[in-house]
Amino acid sequence: MEKNYYALAYYYFGPVSNPHEEIALHKQLFKTMDVSCRIYISEEGINGQFSGYQPDAERYMAWLKQRPDFATVKFKIHHIKENVFPRVTVKYRKELVALGCSVDTSKQGKHISPEEWHEKLQENRCLVLDVRNNYEWKIGHFENAVLPDIETFREFPAYADRLAQEHAPETTPVMMYCTGGIRCELYSALLLEKGFKEVYQLDGGVIAYGLKMGTGKWKGKLFVFDDRMAVPINEADPNVSPISKCSLCDIESDTYYNCANTDCNNLFLCCESCITSQKGCCSEECSQAPRIRTFSAERGNKPFRRKHLCPTIEQTRCCLREKDNQPA
């Protein structure tokens, strides 16, 4: 019988009295559950991405809300068919989001609901800012959004300076969004520090917008940091037309792969035809490389893990094991 799973996205900014104790309690709880996750906890809060068998996911949500430090956490839920993380990862991370500079998160932009966000988009009065990385917005974004060509969140402080130079901060209203909302908590605070007076952030991010409003003013798919890689923002509208193209032949494609060449591992967009002919590689050069991991259409575009070693590495390890087992 097919089991139902949940994918959960959630975060909480606020004081955590003993993050290491919380980490230990999480790990202990998960030993009895069919789950996988990537959860970071620090003195400033929690940032969680989680997948689990539905009863276990519901048990975890109830348990976390009973924890004194996390009583107000909000979960965004997607229905999935299997766990989407390779393992259970719960660890301490001082920066829940790697911005690279400190900001006063007690002063943030105004949180607006998906319904309010949709109305403001129709007014077409604000600068709509995507605060995700370029490979994320390449496959999906809001109509008429400003799309910074940035590869990591650490580049955004410098972009904030540029934004303040290109637009009059005191008279330019800004609406910002990210996947689940946590990056906006920091970036809205940063823009306020730069002098912007009217800053709005989409409460719950694109995930919450999709759950409440459907596709609405969104184009394409949503990049997610798990085995799914890309999802429609609303389960009721799965057949979304791609807005991006295959990097090899230029036909429409919104499917990301990691290059099968171990020494490259580049994240790239590719169509089914090209990914098959290139043996899972991002270029002809990589397809001829000596250390290529085995690609198969059956595994789809799931990211390669440590277990997906190329034959050359496997052979080397086997030889070393055989050598170690030789009598002296």
From Swiss-Prot:
Domain of life, source organism: Bacteria
Active site: C178
Enzyme Commission code(s) on record: 1.14.-.-
Catalytic reactions of this protein: uridine(34) in tRNA + AH2 + O2 = 5-hydroxyuridine(34) in tRNA + A + H2O
MF-aspect GO terms: oxidoreductase activity, acting on paired donors, with incorporation or reduction of molecular oxygen
First-level EC class: oxidoreductase
SUPFAM superfamilies xrefs: Rhodanese/Cell cycle control phosphatase
Pfam family, one: Rhodanese_C
Membrane-spanning ranges: none
GO biological process, one term: tRNA modification
InterPro entries in alphabetical order: Rhodanese-like_dom (IPR001763), Rhodanese-like_dom_sf (IPR036873), Rhodanese_C (IPR022111), TrhO (IPR020936), TRHO_N (IPR040503)
Keywords on record: Oxidoreductase, tRNA processing
Chain ranges of the Rhodanese domain: 122-218
PANTHER family per the UniProt record, alphabetical: RHODANESE-LIKE DOMAIN-CONTAINING PROTEIN 7-RELATED, THIOSULFATE SULFURTRANSFERASE/RHODANESE-LIKE DOMAIN-CONTAINING PROTEIN 2
Family: Belongs to the TrhO family.
Function text: Catalyzes oxygen-dependent 5-hydroxyuridine (ho5U) modification at position 34 in tRNAs.
HAMAP family, per database record: TrhO (MF_00469)
Protein name: tRNA uridine(34) hydroxylase
The organism's taxonomic lineage, starting at the top: Bacteria, Pseudomonadati, Chlamydiota, Chlamydiia, Chlamydiales
